[in-house]
Amino acid sequence: MKLKKMLALTMAAVLAAGLTACGSSADTSAAPAAESTAAAADAAGAPDGDGDPTTLTVAMECAYAPYNWTQSDDSNGAVEVRGSSDYAYGYDVMMAKKIGEALGQKVQIVKLDWDSLIPAVMSGDVDCVIAGQSITAERAAQVDFSDPYYYASIITLTKKDSQYASAASVADLAGATATSQLGTIWYDNCLPQIPDANILPAQETAPSMLVALNSGACDIVVTDRPTGQAALVAYPDFTLLDFGGGDNDFQVSDEDINIGISMKKGNTALKNAINEVLATMTADDYNTMMDEAISVQPLSE
């Protein structure tokens, strides 16, 4: 979580602030587990969007660091973007590769706008979406979700010299000029909780949201912890405000912070196969992966 509002993981969060993953730790029976997962993939009929049963087609924005981004080469294990000379990497790509390996499939990345992700998986053009999606009831009515592959708490970003830099609660943000990304929990659910906030139009992408803050167009932006932690690398003048998840924080449900992999309704075999992979991972695994993603993300993201 972008825990954005509207299936393949392999990284995790630098700050999982008290949030724990529900996957069980891996045991020593790796080969049997891999065989079981591969069998589930076979049973799924490998319903790839391109009709190739050897390929797992995964959609993402490729513009949402540290979850996913675009780069010009295959450094760090990046995967080529379908129909492009560019490559994609990040936490989501790492997870996609981990799942693809377990299923015995090559990963193909499809770059799409945020609002096109759910329609693409519903139509069968792609097998799954791994893009920092929150597992919301609204989305679950349209697609099936895996178990969470990350848990992302909500934070606020502002500049170090801002009047809001010492804020210790949502109430302390009163009167702030604020924005966030279009179609996200952050914009739709969190910003309205700020007393007397001057809420600007939503930004199309996470990078444009950060640019708005950096340029002085707004006082604060609300986002998730991985996005905020990554932003501190690219924008050293920013500071991250974490209100601790209690009464002083933004009031959100578990679904708002559980990040899952979406797939077409009824694709139970693929869902089960992905969940088998996730069940071998722990919260520490997720956090280690996210730390790695943040450490290698392009500063422009």
Task: Give residue ranges: language-model regions.
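A ligand-binding cleft/hinge motif common to bilobed small-molecule-binding domains
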Residues: 116, 132-142, 189-192, 215, ...
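Acidic, polar ligand-binding/catalytic clefts
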Residues: 101, 106-172, 252
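Periplasmic-binding protein-like
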Residues: 151-158, 234-278, 296-301
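Bacterial lipoprotein signal-peptidase II cleavage site
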Residues: 5, 18-34
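Bilobed "Venus flytrap"/periplasmic-binding protein-like clamshell domains
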Residues: 65, 85-101, 133, 155-210, ...
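Beta->alpha turn/N-cap motifs
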Residues: 60-64, 110-115, 124-136, 152, ...
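Ligand-binding clefts/hinges and TM-proximal coupling segments of bilobed small-molecule sensing domains
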Residues: 185-202, 242, 272-301
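Extracytoplasmic small-molecule ligand-binding "clamshell" domains
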Residues: 45, 51-133
